[in-house]
Regions:
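Bacterial N-terminal signal peptides that target proteins for export
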Residues: 2-13
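C-terminal segment of classical bacterial N-terminal signal peptides
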Residues: 18-27
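Short, low-complexity N-terminal intrinsically disordered segments enriched in polar/charged residues
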Residues: 29-87, 91, 211-217
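A solvent-exposed, acidic/Ser-Thr-rich amphipathic alpha-helical stretch
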Residues: 62, 66, 82-144, 149-151
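Residue-level detector of short, conserved catalytic/binding motifs and their immediate flanks
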Residues: 71, 140, 174
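Short, surface-exposed loop/helix-turn segments at secondary-structure junctions
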Residues: 152-164
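Short beta-strand edge/turn micro-motifs at domain boundaries
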Residues: 167-200
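Thiol-/selenol-based redox modules, centered on thioredoxin-like
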Residues: 200-209
């Protein structure tokens, strides 16, 4: 089966970024559920189950962590809640998607749910495995893997990449900045190159070499 070339990745990233920038209204998302907010008072038992670098958190840090954990819950395939996700942000909150060809795409307002909706469209069973969590005041830093099964179409300007049923697992680093119990900024660093490789988009080294040669286009 012929797979898209590495040059196509630019188009794919553009499609992804376009999908994120436009976003999808909560009413259009796949089977959204009513938001069920977690308690701000995470217990010692709750904390013991998490991969925390330091379990001695202040009350404010526990509350901030609870907000972030709720955001992940709202982005899971079996509990997708775009509106609930947006409600966790401050009025001027921003989500920065980082790692694509464009470098950074910023989402605000009704666009904030664009990232979780975009990912759930081709990974309907999406799950985030949290590997390491560091809480420092109003900043929550998390190393994680985004996992799922390629069961939905992946839209690109060149056409649709049809689902293959492949298992997807790519690394991500998330940095959450909170203010007064709301998310002020969410920087999401996604390893798009790893994701594209698992979707079957292979590098086209020959074209890159040709383009770099004298007189190349």
């Amino acid at each position: 089966m012929k797979v898209p070339s590495w040059k196509t990745i630019t188009g794919l990233a553009a499609a992804a970024i376009l999908a994120l920038a436009i976003g999808t209204a909560p009413s259009q998302a796949a089977t959204p559920v009513q938001s069920t907010k977690v308690s701000a008072g995470l217990s010692a038992s709750d904390l013991s189950k998490l991969p925390l670098t330091d379990r001695h958190l202040t009350e404010r840090e526990r509350a901030n962590l609870a907000v972030v954990l709720q955001a992940y819950h709202d982005g899971e395939g079996d509990s997708l809640d775009p509106q609930g996700f947006m409600d966790l942000f401050a009025a001027d909150g921003v989500l920065n998607g980082i790692g694509g060809v464009e470098g950074q795409t910023s989402l605000r307002g009704t666009q904030l749910s664009g990232l979780i909706v975009f990912l759930s469209q081709f990974l309907p069973d999406i799950h985030r495995e949290l590997k390491q969590i560091t809480v420092s005041g109003d900043v929550v830093s998390i190393e994680l893997s985004i996992q799922g099964t390629f069961l939905g179409p992946f839209q690109t300007p060149a056409g649709v990449i049809r689902p293959t049923g492949a298992k997807i697992d790519f690394p991500t680093a998330d940095f959450w900045y909170l203010r007064n119990g709301k998310i002020e900024k969410f920087d999401c660093h996604i390893a798009f190159a790893t994701l594209f490789g698992q979707l079957g988009i292979l590098p086209d080294y020959a074209s890159a070499v040709a383009a770099s040669a004298p007189g190349g286009n």
